Amino acid sequence: LRKNRISYIFQGLELFGDLTAMDNILLKNRITGYKTHEEIIEMAEVLHVTSSLHKKCRILSFGQQQRVAILRALCQPFQFLFADECFSHIDRRNGEAAMELITRECAGQKAGLVVTSLGNSQEGFHEKIVL
């Protein structure tokens, strides 16, 4: 069920600290084969984490780790994406980029999105979501 229908951005991120950001992303993508390497790089550029892809996750800031977790969650087909506090440590510019990417991916898959605790920094996000 989780492989093809549900994707999740965990509040605790659930990244492997001793693996690079790219290795964490590829763990999911190797199972599904959903995204090409080029697509992953393009999404990393959108989220401004290309320079972090070959660094171990344990040395990244929490905001960078959140963006890596978002990328990992988007590397599979899904009918629903659950995002638990996935913007809490992301600045406004990167938060807007993440919202646009998530919105684009959900619309492309005609998927539903459930987001918890948006707070003020993502005001208006619900208006952009395609369910």
What are these regions (language model features)?
Residues 12, 19-31:
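Q-loop/switch helix immediately C-terminal to the Walker
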Residues 77:
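Conserved catalytic motifs of ABC-family nucleotide-binding domains
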Residues 81-84:
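Catalytic Walker B motif of ABC-type/P-loop ATPase nucleotide-binding domains
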